[in-house]
Amino acid sequence: MKIDVLTLFPEMFQSPFEESIFKRATDNNLVRLEIHNFRDFAHDKHHAVDDSPYGGGAGMLLKPEPLFEAVEDVLREDPTPAPVILLSPQGRSFNQEVARELAKHERLIIICGHYEGFDERVREHLSTDEISIGDFVLTGGELAAMVVIDAVSRLIPGVLGSGESSQDDSHSNGLLEHPHYTRPPVFRGWGIPDVLLSGNHAQINRWRRKESLRRTLKRRPDMFEKIPLSKADRKLVDEILAEENTQG
């Protein structure tokens, strides 16, 4: 996958993507990241990319000309089709389902917002998608872009060392992950569930599924309501509710 990022602060992307999993992905040509400073496409003497809004009001807006020219230049260099994604608090909520959707593309073009936002013509005539990573305010879209890039890259075949790694992550199957334990078996008097030491893989898998259901039901009831439960899942949920009632 090729990912083009349009930003005013290209230096922000250097360190995070030169380490760990993403570096291996780029070294193995699984992901190609190209950063473009769209200030290079501002042609006045001050290289201004923003201006005050018509009708008045606080703040500045990103002008349409530099962004349109930047995207057009990127597509001229490489005409591979790609969704043009605005990172904006007005966008659809980013989640694992959206990450899977984006991972199916050969290429992404991501525009990082700043100031009070974009001239509306960018939204109407340039972008094809608009994404928000949450209901909070950031100084710019760079951190949001990093979140999207990281989440999407993990889903590209070959990026992770284990084929099961991304499938077992929280949210990948609609559930939060089950608890994990490693050595030592007892730490400061705190042990681990006996089933994990039993060697019985069927029982271990049952325990993991049950704890995923328990954790999702308790921490993310909104997610739990959307999960299609099998007959075995419903039995586990009944056990969980009975245990919770006993403890309560």
UniProtKB/Swiss-Prot annotation:
Pfam families: tRNA_m1G_MT. One of its GO terms (biological process) is tRNA N1-guanine methylation. S-adenosyl-L-methionine binds at G113, I133, G134, D135, F136, V137, L138. Disulfide bonds: none annotated. InterPro entries: Alpha/beta_knot_MTases (IPR029028), tRNA_m1G_MeTrfase_C_sf (IPR023148), tRNA_m1G_MeTrfase_TrmD (IPR002649), tRNA_m1G_MTases_N (IPR029026), tRNA_MeTrfase_TRMD/TRM10 (IPR016009). The keyword Lipid metabolism does not apply. It catalyses: guanosine(37) in tRNA + S-adenosyl-L-methionine = N(1)-methylguanosine(37) in tRNA + S-adenosyl-L-homocysteine + H(+). The keyword Acyltransferase does not apply. It is an enzyme of class 2 (transferase). It comes from the Bacteria. Homodimer. Belongs to the RNA methyltransferase TrmD family. NCBIfam families: PRK00026.1 (NF000648), trmD (TIGR00088). Specifically methylates guanosine-37 in various tRNAs. This is tRNA (guanine-N(1)-)-methyltransferase.
